[in-house]
C-alpha cells in the first residue's frame, strides 16, 4: 500500500503525546509543528487516527505543497494539481484557510484563490464544475499558509474529533474531550487502570473527565459513535477497509467490558450539571459503569468497594466560576484535606489556570505540565497522596540546599522584573516554537551571575563561579535572593528547582557524579525524546545551545551514514535516527554517557543494529588505521576544549589538535559528505591551512536560537566539505 503524509492537529501543548499516540496507529513522525504533527503512513493508519485518536482535532491528508509568495503563484500552484482525484464529479467542497504572509494577508482572500484554482483545474480538464458548499460539503480542502509555502490537504475527519457525540449539553466551564484525554495520559491513568486502580473526579461538571477515563480504560474508540467522517465521499475512500476498522472497534468495545471494570465516579456540588453529566453518560453508552452524584467536596467520603489505588483528577473552577481569591484558596485547601484523608495511596491530578493555589493543597507536587485550556494558559499538577508528601509550613532545606532569603528587596525586584520580561520574550518564543527546554536567563544582570534553564516545567540554575575579588558572603546573599525569586516568578515547586555552581570543566570533572539521586526524566525536542538528569552531574545530558545544530542534522540525515564523535549522551544521534539516517556510529570514552546514549536511542525506537554506540577514545579511534576504511556521509564532532582523562591515549587541547582531528574526519567523509565541527572554546581560532585544503564555512550565527543569542561565543560551528564536492 502507498504511503501518505498527514498533518494531524491537536490542542496546543499536546503535540508530543499525539506523536506517541499516532505511532501506535502506524503513523511515523516526520516533524512537529505548533498545535499539530506531520506524520507518514498508509491510508489505513489515517483512518485509525480518525476513529481512535483521543487527542487529535483533525486528520488532514496532504495533497501537495505549492509556492505561494504571491496570490498569482498560489493560484498557479493550485490549478496545476489533479483535483478530480480528490473531489467527486459534480460534487461539493469547501476550503478552510489558515495563515498569512506579506502577499496574502486575509484568509478569506486566500481561500477564494484556492477555490478559484480548484474550480478552474476541474473545468479545464473537461469535468463538471464542482459547487462550493460552506456547510456539509462532500469534501473539505485544508489550506495552511506558512511564509511562502501553502500546504493543501483533504480533511479526512470532516469535523473536530474532540466532538465524540456524547456531549451536546455543557456545564458551566466545559473541558474539551481531547484535552481531557491528554490530562488522563499525562496523569498516568492507563497504567493506573491496568494495575487495578479506580477513577474519581471531585468537581466533575458535565462529566467529561470521568467519561473519557472510562472510554480509555474500556478500550472504546472515541469516534465509535460518529455517524459521518470527511472521507466518505472522497474519491480515494476505501469503504471495505473502513468497514473492517469499524467492526474491529465494535469488537474491542465489547471485549473491553469483560472482566474487571474500574470504578468511575464523578461528584459536583451543582445538581444541574450532574443532570447534564447523566445525559452525557447515557449518550456515551456508559450507563451503569460511570456514576455521578451531587455532593460538595466537604461531604466526600470514600466508597467501601474502591481500590486502594487510583486516580483522582479534577479541574477546579477558576476565573469565571469563582471570583474571590480567598474562596478559591479555601476550595483548594479543602480538596487537599479531603484527598489526604480519604484517598491515601492514590494519585491526585489538578488541572488549573491558577497554579499559584496549588500550595494550598498542602501536598508536594512531583510533576507539573504546562498546557492550555483553549487560549488560557494552565497547568496540570500531579501529586502522590502519601503522608510523607505533605507540605509543612516551614520545610527545612535538604543538606547543601540554598535557603531562600531576600536581603535586598530592591535588588531582588530587579531580578523579578527581568525574569518576567524574559518570560514574555524568550518564553513566548519558546512556546510558539514548541520548545520545552530553553535558557531563560544567562547572567543578564551582573548582580546575579546565573544561567537559568527550563526543562519542561523544571528549573536548572547554574551559578557561575565568582572571581576571588567578589565577597563570598555577598555572593551567597544574592544566590539566596535568586532562590527566593525564581520559584515565585516561574511558579514551580521548590523540589523542581535545582541549583549548582558552574565551573570550568577539566580532565574528568564533567564525568564525575555530583549526587546519586538517579532522578532521570524525559524531555522532548523537535520530535525526539531525550533523557535528562538535573541533579547528579555538572551537566544535564542535553546541551541546549546546540539545539539548532541537532535539528539541522535531523532535517538532513535521511538516508545518510552518520558519525557522532565525542557523542556525550547521543542527542545528535537521536535526531539523525529520527531524521531517517540509514545507520550511525556514536563514540564516547565515558561508560556513563555511552549507556545514556543507548537509552536515548531506545526511547526513540532506533534499531540498535543500525545505530551503534561504543565506548572509545575518539583520538585513538581516529588515529587507528583499522577504522580508516569506514566512510560516513555526515559527521558531527563537538570535542571538549581540554581533556587529560586517564582513559585517553593522550591529552586533548582543541586549539592545538583541531586541525589534525578535522583532517582525520575528512579522511572518513564521503566525497559529497559534510563534517559539522563545533567547539565552545571562546578564544578559538581555526587553522587557516584548513581553508586551503577544504571548503570551510562558518555557520555559528545560524546555530544560535533566540535563547542563546545574548551569548554569541557560547560555541562556534563550521561546515566543512571536500573541495569541488
Curated annotation (Swiss-Prot):
One of its GO terms (molecular function) is RNA binding. Residues 45-156 form the THUMP domain. Keywords: Cytoplasm, Methyltransferase, RNA-binding, rRNA processing, S-adenosyl-L-methionine, Transferase. Signal peptide: none annotated. Disulfide bonds: none annotated. It catalyses: guanosine(2445) in 23S rRNA + S-adenosyl-L-methionine = N(2)-methylguanosine(2445) in 23S rRNA + S-adenosyl-L-homocysteine + H(+); guanosine(2069) in 23S rRNA + S-adenosyl-L-methionine = N(2)-methylguanosine(2069) in 23S rRNA + S-adenosyl-L-homocysteine + H(+). It is found in: Cytoplasm. Pfam families: Methyltrans_SAM, RlmL_1st, THUMP, UPF0020. Its EC number is 2.1.1.173, 2.1.1.264. It comes from the Bacteria. GO terms for cellular component: cytoplasm. It is an enzyme of class 2 (transferase). Its main location: cytoplasm. Belongs to the methyltransferase superfamily. RlmKL family. HAMAP family: 23SrRNA_methyltr_KL. This is Ribosomal RNA large subunit methyltransferase K/L. It comes from Marinobacter nauticus (strain ATCC 700491 / DSM 11845 / VT8) (Marinobacter aquaeolei). The gene is rlmL.
